[in-house]
Amino acid sequence: MKRTHGRPVSLIKEEKMSYQPENITDILSRGVRESLFSKHLELVPQLNEVYELELAYYESKILTDEEIIRNGAYFARVGNTLTRHFLVCSGEPVRLPQHSSSRLRSFFQTNQFKTGYATHGLFPYRGKFHPQMIKGVINVMGLKPGDTVLDPMMGSGTVLIEAKLMGIKSVGVDASPFCRFMTQVKLDALTVPLTPVREALKNCRSVYDYFVKLAGQPNQGSKKRFGRDSGDLFSIRDSGDKYVPRSASRVDLPWGSEIPEVYNFLLLAYLDGAGYSERSDRKSPYDQFHAILERYLFVAEKVQLVLAGAESELAESKALEGDARCLPIQDSSSIDGIIFSPPYSFAIDYLENDSFHLNFLGTDIDRLREEMIGLRGRTLRQKFELYETDMEKVLSECARVLRPGRICTIVVGTNKNQLSKILEVPPGEVKGIDELLVELGKPHGLNLIRKLSRQITGMANTMRTEFIVLLQRR
């Protein structure tokens, strides 16, 4: 009789036959979620990607139950207590203009817990982070209330908004004046006085006429961009880098609209509506502005209802205009964590995307194009070479300001087929942008500790995969 390690083969076969059905049933009845998470933790709906499950698992291991309730990104309930993330995201999803496509409406409905909640839904921005993902990343980086997180390329301010809600101090830097302005409005909208905004909506026509008088009316459906002399909106920008009404009479606005936070809220809604009108003639510019202001008010009311009584827990945040290659932060080793996404320079021309609004704010777009990372250079190859040089400087600055042992997270997309055409080499020989950044970080003491990946939707022709790259400072 054949024997295996002293046991008859026939006996081993009988054991397998007798135990296998029971084991399979037991394994399948538990499922992956039950195997990974404690029974008292309930995941949020719509969690359906591997990277989300990974981040949720890390949250469950790194955070206490109290921290999950306060700041968790992927859990709806801890025991009998609903999490703040679930409460902020619950209810009616973000309101969209009536002419919005069914695809866009479906996106917000099926991604209610990922994006569009809090004030992230103000002013849609191409290439923006998933806010829920950023909240999860902040948690797995070990950042706690009172710490400071930096986004050196803040874009629409997702990192700053999430950090503020989590009680984590934040600093954001961007070369674009419009990004700085947009981010500040989204931050202020968490606590903006609502009564004056409601009054402005009731008197929407006078508010609209005020901005038309100040800045000019968009050329509806023309897709033409205004020049710097098209309006006078840029003159409201004062020396303190705030936006306050100066060129037109304040009496033209409803009561309370002169409050800077309220005024900026209305201004962003106007710019948002003007941008829509420039791209589409489905609605008149006024009707577009009215619909967007109504949506903005809904967003602010919804998040402030959840935050009522907890306003003191919101952390300090600073949105700055500046250069990531030479950060406006003097103190070295003063930042507890860094999160940023390099510009998708080969996928999105951010200045073309924002030129309507930048012109309204009086920005010299040609000058800005020569300064922005990813847009410098004439040919695609030259752009890529300058991009590599610039990103090395950015990582050097990140290493300078980051405390030793802390983490710098880079969220970056890549498309090797596209890069192979630019560099004129086979796709198999091309390094992805994620690999390039890991190499650039090593000489500055930034070492890879984890990399997660996710598929990108909506940018399939340019970026197919996005990586979450976690680098630790030596």
Name what the model sees in each region:
Residues 121-125, 378-389, 418-435:
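Acceptor-substrate binding/catalytic loop of class I
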Residues 368, 406-412:
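Conserved beta-strand signature within the Rossmann-like core of class I S-adenosyl-L-methionine
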Residues 244-340, 345-351:
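SAM-dependent nucleic-acid methyltransferase catalytic core
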Residues 389-404:
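A short glycine-rich, Lys/Arg-flanked "PGG" loop and its adjoining helix->strand segment in the class I
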Residues 130, 136-210, 305-330, 337-340, ...:
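Conserved S-adenosyl-L-methionine
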Residues 403, 461-474:
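Core SAM-dependent methyltransferase catalytic element
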Residues 181-251, 255-256, 363-377:
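Conserved phosphoryl-transfer catalytic core
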Residues 6, 11-143:
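S-adenosyl-L-methionine
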